[in-house]
């Protein structure tokens, strides 16, 4: 389901470089599998794939079916890994434009999945409340600790709003949190909210295949079993060191990091994959960016950003590498019409497909950027479907673990994010 092409990037290295670093990469890979590396207690994201819980998947599907039946809007409150994974999968696989209402019910075929609690904009919350007025709303509050300021502040605003409008407000609130402790856990106990547990040993940025991501994804009408088992299949494939694309990706990134490269661009040519880019950005930024190490991850969308950042990528400082995330098989090609004239200068494209033009844009950018001194490689998804996307998610999670171990850091903690919180809470007068 995943293919990794690093042939062009290898031309920027000596012939023996990749093989020379491979023993270290394989050792990092064994640390992950044998649970001997730093942060090994946070490998719950692998454990849940090694022992799939089909009963949990069925329960999530049942809850999602109720929400799809009852809700106009499903509102997810979360920040970072508590929303980026779900948003990425939904943007990649759900319809991009709202379906027409059903004639008999005048209700959308699927509830609208919205996100809040991922920033501190009061204006956004006010406009959100106005938008929700008169709509049937369910809320999913996602926070392992129950102390995440952005998320819990949004819930503090929304809870009385829900209680004032829905007699069954407690049933409409679903929390995803620690199974045994924390403020959100205790609130669920007090008010009788339904709960889903974030499994032990799963950090936020690795939680997309837990109820954190699976419930919103299921509400959006996406097949979570195919998504989950696509990841299971990739997890099994990546157990071996031979023909291991995640190991190759981590090793290549490490080689360029050690040669002074500072930035990795993840470039997509399919707008639906932009959310995967945002999820990838957090995954690699929080996992690697410590002890003065790590490539700065930046996700961009082509061909749009070729008209803004393309100049820098082509001729700016030579301190970046570029990874393309592409889809091999595109469904339902759109043919460019023959309009009978050439007033727009595009008659040479008549009869070809928009997808073909997009592919040539990728091929052109790949060659031009490589010729301009940027090491480029490509991660290929087989198709834009739940199984392939699940494989993609696991591929990047596995790769970042190896990459962190290669750098000599714990890829599963994020001590630096506490610094701004301490200053913010001090300024707010929190005791």
Where does each model-flagged region fall?
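Helicase-primase coupling helices
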Residues: 298-383
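Glycine-rich phosphate/diphosphate-binding loops that line cofactor/substrate pockets in enzymes
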Residues: 59-72, 128-137, 252-262, 313-318
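Active-site phosphate/pyrophosphate-binding segments
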Residues: 165-323, 328, 416-431
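Generic C-terminus detector
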Residues: 391-431
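Short, charged beta->alpha transition segments
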Residues: 62, 122-130, 250-254, 326, ...
